[in-house]
């Protein structure tokens, strides 16, 4: 999570002290998250038209669609095409020039960055657009309250790099009793094209290998649907895909440590161990402006209206200080 720390760490802690408008229900669920009032409304400019192609993250797919819808209300002559098949599809699309926008739910890897530099001679630019708590979901009827990351590793990984040797196969091994004790764990996850797959592998599985029994799904919504329909299901996805059929459980970084709910306050403070920054990568040549349509679309995303869409879609908005830093990258 080094990218996240370098992008938002100190600013987020300051934002809490400054009193970001955060409300959490007594059950710890996400509730009443509001956009930082210091984020400015979007200011429409003249002369914006043309086409934008976005290829990348499935996690960001709905957000991109909502942002595009709002942006087209400002600029009806703009066409935005969005394809969300996974974060790994973004870097090659930017290199090939088939997309101007590369949404990713994880930071770009060095070899992906190097491929862009090799072709264009300058580095690709990542713009933070929203925050996310990568949630571990269970069925709404499941009584489990919390897990540690070592336990999550022992559930999903066959290599057990998190430190627990025991191979968890039933809910009873995780402390559930009665009718739940003998129910087998039913694992749902993303496929390898997904940035969420890679992020979870690195941070929850300590870079270990997934079990062969994980039912890989093509999208975040499919993971949540699987857990909804399978009473003994457990899966991972961005918090924005939460539905009434599942619950996101509290997580702790270590065995015996206090568990934190995946809410805004805990993401900002760093208490929730699977928080991340959602990004849009662009090929911005040094000392040259992006095309007006690409620049204005990103400015819209980083405006009051754009961050309100983040909240509407169930994700977490950026503090104003972070927005200012991201906007500066567009200059």
Q: How would you name each of these model-derived features?
A:
Residues 14, 26-32:
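Sec/Tat signal peptide C-region and signal peptidase I cleavage site
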Residues 3-17:
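Bacterial N-terminal signal peptides that target proteins for export
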Residues 31-331:
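Flexible loop/hinge segments at secondary-structure junctions
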């Amino acid at each position: 999570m080094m990218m996240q720390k370098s992008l938002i760490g100190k600013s987020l802690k300051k934002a809490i002290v400054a009193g970001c408008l955060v409300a959490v229900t007594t059950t710890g669920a996400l509730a009443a998250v509001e956009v930082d009032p210091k984020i400015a409304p979007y200011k429409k400019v003249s002369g914006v038209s043309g086409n934008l192609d976005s290829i990348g993250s499935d996690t960001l797919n709905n957000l991109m669609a909502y942002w595009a819808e709002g942006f087209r209300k400002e600029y009806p002559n703009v066409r935005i095409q969005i394809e969300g098949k996974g974060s790994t599809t973004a870097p090659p699309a930017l290199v090939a020039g088939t997309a101007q926008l590369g949404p990713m739910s994880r930071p770009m890897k060095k070899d992906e960055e190097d491929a862009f530099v090799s072709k264009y001679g300058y580095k690709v630019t990542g713009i933070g657009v929203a925050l996310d708590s990568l949630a571990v979901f269970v069925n709404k009827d499941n009584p489990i309250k919390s897990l540690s990351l070592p336990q999550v590793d022992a559930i999903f990984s066959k290599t057990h790099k998190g430190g627990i040797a025991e191979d968890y196969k039933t809910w009873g091994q995780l402390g559930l009793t009665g009718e739940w004790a003998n129910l087998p764990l039913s694992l749902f996850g993303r496929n390898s094209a997904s940035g969420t797959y890679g992020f979870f592998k690195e941070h929850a599985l300590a870079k270990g290998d997934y079990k062969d029994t994980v039912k890989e799904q093509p999208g975040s919504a499919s993971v949540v649907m699987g857990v909804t329909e399978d009473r003994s299901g457990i899966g991972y996805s961005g918090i924005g895909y939460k539905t009434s059929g599942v619950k996101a459980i509290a997580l702790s970084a270590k065995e015996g440590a206090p568990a934190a709910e995946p809410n805004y306050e805990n993401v900002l403070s760093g208490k929730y161990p699977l928080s991340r920054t959602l990004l849009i990568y662009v090929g911005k040549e040094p000392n040259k402006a992006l095309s007006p349509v690409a620049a204005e679309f990103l400015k819209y995303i980083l405006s009051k209206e754009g961050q309100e869409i983040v909240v509407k879609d169930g994700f977490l908005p950026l503090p104003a200080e972070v927005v200012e830093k991201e906007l500066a990258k567009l200059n």
